[in-house]
Amino acid sequence: MRKVFISSISMQKVNAFKYDSGVYPENNPTAFPITISLENNCQPGDEVAFITIVTHSEGNLAVENYHKFCEQAGSICREKGARAEFIELAVSARIEAASPRRLYKEIVAKLQDNDEIYADITYGFKYNPIVIFAALNNAYQVRENVDIKEICYGNLYNGSAEIKPEYFDVTSLFYLNSLSGLMGVEGMMGDGGNVLL
């Protein structure tokens, strides 16, 4: 079993903040909210895979931020006695109609049976959270023994200019969506279990 951490890297300058979290009250300052999940869920001997979406273009800081992320996540894994694998999904800053579908296929191809998955939807293009949710749904429905443990995001602003870092767990939305899908299928079933068209 692998513990898989999926996230996107910011294209802008990032700063470390201590995030207020009802899920993990004790956490270290970070610029990458997914590391909060890592710190609190990584155990000695774990096999950890980081699937990270990195936007490549001239003038943005994503590649530099990715190197900082790898250093921080790698350090946490070493401290915990876990083995880390870093998988970079390089994407172009130029968005095309096929970009979301291409990213979806790349994420799905990297997921395996028995994965325990944590995802962070803080950074990235507007379509990234939808793509990540869709890829997780595919893994949950198609792969064997996949567990979607957590979907989180870090928020810095709460309706004012004052920075107020908060860490939110939105995993329940994933499972509500899965249940809605099942209820939709149930509504289409006839007496014999056949789908009504």
Name every feature range the model reports, one short phrase each:
Residues 1-116, 137-197:
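Long, low-complexity, Lys/Arg-enriched
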Residues 93-97, 121-129:
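Acidic, metal-coordinating catalytic cores used for nucleic-acid/nucleotide bond scission
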Residues 126-141:
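Short Gly/Thr/Asp-enriched flexible loops that form oxyanion-binding sites at enzyme active sites
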